[in-house]
Amino acid sequence: RAGSWIARPICDVNDATSGFFAFRKKLIQSLPEGARGYKIMLELIMAGQGKLNVTEVPIRFNNRQHGTSKLSFSHQWTYLQRLIALAGGTVTVNTASRFALVGFFGVLIDVLIFQLMMRHGAGLGFAHMLGFIVAATFNYSLNSKWAFRQHYDGTLRWRLFSRFLTVSIFALLLRGGILALLVYAWHVPPLLAIFPAIIATATINYFGSAFYVFPDEKHSLSPDIRWRVAAIGVVIFILSLRLVYFGLAQLIPDETYYWQYAQHMDLSFYDHPPMVAWLIWLGTSILGHNEFGVRIGAILCGFIAMSYLYAFAQNLYDKSTAMRAVLIFSILPLGFASGTLMTPDAPLVAAWAATLYYMERALLADRHTAWLGMSIAFGIGILSKYTLGLLGITALLFVILDPTARRWMKRPHPYLAATLALILFSPVIIWNIQNEWASFAFQSTRLLDDGYNFAVHNLIIYMTIMLTPIGLIAAGYALLSSNSPEDDTFVRRRRLFVQVFTGLPLFIFFVLSTFDLPKFHWTGPIWLAIIPTIAWMMTQANHLSPMAKRLKTAWQPTIIICTFAYALILHYLVLGIPGAPYPHSLTKHYYWRETAAEVERIAKSVRNKTGKEPIIVGMSKWSIASALSFYTHESTNLDIRSRNLMGDSGAMYDYWLPSQLSTDRPIIQISMKHTHLDKNRHGDDIRHLLIRPGIIEHRVIERYDVPIRSVYYRVSKGLEEILNF
């Protein structure tokens, strides 16, 4: 069974290792000369390049009762080698042993340089990067001239060198995360942590060299197989990045605010439904109140979204398209961010993908049982974010437009599904009833709070960010494609499904952007419906227009650039990049652990001078107060409030910590801008609310002895009654 499972990614049969099969005799001529092993059926299927019609007839055998299996280790190793060769790799005993020998000397060089740099006071990031660069240069020279000599003539080729450089950079950036995980999270000494980091890097380098740098070019592979192999490699790397870095990178203010949700558990909240709070509460209960505990829910939601997207794409098209769909989703910003950051978008995207899957099963495949799954997914989705309600409107439009799906309007299933989804949504309804419909009122009026703004151009920019330019062009091409006379009924219904479930939500966002500024991430989930079609177009370009062919060519650099960008950003956030400064546009909203430590020192100084416990007031709606609360909750018990203490709005802080009349406890205002210490967001002076306000001071926040930002603060003796304001 294990043999058949590992063969499934590159072929479309369930049991590629079966010894019972029948085929036309002339197909035996298609077998390659280098075919080895005993699984002839696998060789035939791969030689067919996806052009064979294969029918499987299940046969159940009893487990062996007598004797022993003829499979020896040599048989299994031969099978694995052949499987890798069929996938385009050059993994052999010869190349592996030579690569290992070269790698051994590379490890010695790497470790020596790393230890030398660390002993001379270099930072962890600089030491590991310098050691890797020197060792990788040495390894490339010997690998190209010796380890892979039978597949490569040893001369310098810039194309191969650029590929080697790409693989090496990816390995380097992931290695930094592994090293940081071992040192910062698991407290392994750096001189020991470098060894497992090197082993992980060597694994990436070897398989990257075998499949990408020095692939087997003697036997041509179909584009379909090449994309499958690329999908497997890239998705594994993306998942590795998430798993390594998700607990190392500091939380963004939004995540700390939702962590505050979990500290004040309720049926719902003012600005979002409760799902994000429930997931954070569960994660922190298991892993603790740290980045790991907060973000584990996002990681799981990312896996769920990938799984449902794969199944959805396979139902619409085929297995190869499904693998490419997961690849595209993984490298697009909408997929990477939602699977890494613990915001309401994480469960929303997972629920959106699940709802699409069940809606396709119900409306296109006519599966009665899919309505139950749809109701649960839809209910969970609107418990994550109200945006998922758009799928309900979209489903109604599709049922109206599609004659076959219209039959469901006469059946009880849709109405029972809607009832169950409403029951799941009931906690939000109950909370709103108890709080004068505050959340519904906020969501329905927030668009025009800042006045009229024509922002269609902003929406287009945000869509470009979420999809990348190539992804946006491909989505537009897929969305505007029309039916062909040769299309059968299923193809027409499939196209209608994709266009309706993408087009209607997109149209609604375009309408909203004509009079108000949208958030950059609002359109993210709506592209899930069209990603399978984009993935299908990647291998159908020969039958499409010249534009589609150019899009096909552009996907490879897009995948590389996006993957590199994520790895570089994560390494930069955790370990930094030698010589790269910290831009103010980033640091003014990030690195709150260092800022919180400085605020603790300020509070300690005020406490020692006054003998009273100060009140920390973050002069923003919720971001400063939430970030400081998260990064001080273990070390100190500071009394941290939001700007609502000064009479301004504070979102959920209005419910958790409402403003008080007056106090003689010291007030420490904290802000990233000094103007926010004097005036509120409307421009009104707030200094008369303070008792004997001091001068505005600032502290420079450093990270690895590098200045990253300034924090402004003012200490006052107390607070007057807000009613006088």
Protein language model annotation of sequence segments:
Residues 314-320, 355-371, 478:
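Membrane-interface transmembrane helices that cradle and orient dolichyl/undecaprenyl
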Residues 540-576:
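Signature aromatic-anchored transmembrane alpha helix within multi-pass, membrane-resident enzymes
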Residues 296-316, 354, 358:
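Transmembrane-helix motifs of polytopic, lipid-linked glycan transferases
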Residues 241, 391-495, 501-516:
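Transmembrane-lumen/periplasm boundary regions of multi-pass, lipid-linked membrane glycan transferases
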Residues 334, 340-348:
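Short acidic/glycine- and proline-prone juxtamembrane loop motifs at membrane-interface regions
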Residues 1-93:
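Conserved catalytic loops of nucleotide-sugar-dependent glycosyltransferases that act on lipid-linked
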Residues 235, 325-333, 378, 382:
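Short helix- or helix-capping micro-motifs
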Residues 308, 586-725:
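Luminal/periplasmic acceptor-recognition loop/helix of membrane-associated glycosyltransferases
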